[in-house]
């Protein structure tokens, strides 16, 4: 590679603009590039300059779409993930993977996996309950690679932190007067975790955004929901299943949150809207409506079985102000298909790509089991 004879700062500037998938292909062929790809300074600088992708996880593979080029990278899921369901939390290109053992004595298994490098490490998790809540991040007052795992047991009313370097679990105290009802709806941002949560108590539940600060090891409510989290009746099979509006939480502009919502109106029309917050570090955090459109014929109607089978769609707002959405959309009674959408801020569909043809929507085994916004990286899992 002749360009590697250029000054090192010029070479790095070029490589920072090169997708990590391309660097991985070239890494074995060049000693200088190999050394850079193992240099933590370069790895984290490249990560901070990399663009977001969207990821969908299946039982046997993951798919990562580049929303700008529409290229899709398909990688196999480790054979060790021997379960019919599992979900993930993304942090710096690493995935905290949780799946449930088979049989009567069911408990969670945990592993940290980098799909790009293939590195995989298991985390001791004996007797973790299937309803436990997890988080994945790092303390901002220490080294960037000091990754930690949060575990919350509502049943045992206990909280623990796992340090990936020391490989030890450590308990800490917290008040658990809230619950996260959809743990697959998690957002990692700047080392911390964010979820959609509900208060617990005798009174009417209030929906709000809960956070966990890995530096202070404390939970903190960030803000309330921008609207009443309405519950509607939806007919499923021979019964009535109670579901909320389709809601997706995501990050926005590095230090803010965004919220996607699709609701069914009384006249069988659908409204799609996106809300964004100011900086989550501000003293008062509030929502502003970013986007709203009602019954646009080109926009998808999300698969109504999404939350029943954990197929939560994923989205983010691109720097061009477009909404990047990868979802299962309704495709006739009992069926869905998977499509990627780039939606302009006026509701126009700029790009659409069907990534999976029509399939049965109510629990098909080969369908997506989890999804997230993902930034590919070569970040190593701590030894």
UniProtKB/Swiss-Prot annotation:
SUPFAM superfamilies: F-box domain. It holds the Pfam family FBA_1. Residues 1-47 form the F-box domain. InterPro entries: F-box-assoc_dom_typ1, F-box-assoc_interact_dom, F-box-like_dom_sf, SCF_F-box_component. NCBIfam families: F_box_assoc_1. PANTHER family: BNACNNG10540D PROTEIN (PTHR31672), F-BOX PROTEIN CPR30-LIKE (PTHR31672:SF13). This is Putative F-box protein At1g77650. It comes from Arabidopsis thaliana.
